A protein has these predicted regions:
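N-terminal Rossmann NAD(P)H-binding glycine-rich loop of SDR-like oxidoreductase domains
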Residues: 8, 13-36
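NAD(P)H-binding glycine-rich loop region in Rossmannoid oxidoreductase-like domains
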Residues: 49, 55-96
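Conserved glycine-rich Rossmann-like NAD(P)H-binding loop of the short-chain dehydrogenase/reductase
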Residues: 36-49
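Catalytic helix-loop patch of NAD(P)-dependent Rossmann-fold dehydrogenases
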Residues: 95, 129-168
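Alpha-helical substrate-binding/gating segment
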Residues: 172-179, 189-211, 218
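Glycine-rich NAD(P)-binding loop of the Rossmann-fold in SDR/ketoreductase-type enzymes
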Residues: 63, 92-103, 111, 122, ...
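Conserved Rossmann-fold NAD(P)-dependent oxidoreductase catalytic core, especially the SDR/UDP-sugar
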Residues: 103-141
Length: 225
């Protein structure tokens, strides 16, 4: 289902690429991003179901440079949610999140893509104490291999901006859900509507360079500034 726009904008993309389209956030953004582009290209290794007339399904393994290069052809901008989404053993994280991130940015460079929205995580700063309020300018302190891989992705995005001019917004996503389900979630909650607003603003803001932000709603209590 195509949702109506929450973010009024005159910018309309010809073709957007959404990786990780079969995941929980990918499924949520699939209907929401459709109204901001003519064609929404969806990619994942898992089943993405049937496609609507405005959609293209392009399965690809992030660790396979040729497959990633193919899904990048003709794309105007990328929302990169793909990869291993939680703590795992080293090898799948290495292949999907580190090699995969490199393949994605290299393909973006080759195809002239100028904007990437990179799904990072609060786990890149997971070893700060909960009584410390932190911001995106503070040094990373990953709490595991997953957080480490996303810290690499943020630095990779910095390299590709400094060296090639590809702009990125790296969103350290908190706890996205329709509503908070625990007291702990109240400090990290990101509503689905705010997720849409954040991603669309990251895609359409006139100049973002290399930006790292925390993705969280305007909650009464939060760990992040």
């Amino acid at each position: 289902m195509v949702h109506s726009q929450l973010v009024p904008t005159d910018i309309r993309f010809g073709r957007l690429l959404l990786t990780g389209a079969a995941g929980a956030l990918g499924k949520e953004l699939r209907g929401r991003l459709a109204s901001y582009c003519d064609t929404l290209r969806l990619s994942d290794i898992a089943d993405m179901g049937s496609h609507a007339p405005h959609e293209e399904l392009r399965p690809a393994r992030l660790e396979n440079a040729m497959e990633v290069d193919q899904i990048m052809d003709g794309v105007d901008a990328v929302v990169h949610l793909g990869g291993v989404p939680t703590e795992r053993e080293w090898e799948p994280i290495l292949q999907s999140n580190i090699v995969g991130a490199y393949n994605l940015y290299e393909a973006a460079r080759k195809h002239g893509v100028r904007r990437v929205v990179f799904a990072s995580t609060s786990h890149v700063t997971g070893f700060y104490r909960q009584d410390e309020q932190i911001d995106a300018a503070m040094p990373v302190r990953p709490d595991g291999l997953y957080g480490l891989s996303k810290a690499f992705g943020e630095d990779l995005a910095r390299l590709y901006f400094d060296r090639y001019g590809i702009e990125s917004v790296c969103i350290r996503i908190g706890a996205p859900s329709e509503r908070p389900v625990t007291r702990r979630h109240l400090a990290m909650w990101l509503s689905h509507d705010d997720l849409e607003r954040l991603v669309v603003c990251a895609l359409t803001a006139p100049s973002v360079g290399h930006t790292v932000i925390y993705g969280v709603s305007d909650n009464l209590a939060t760990w992040w500034n």
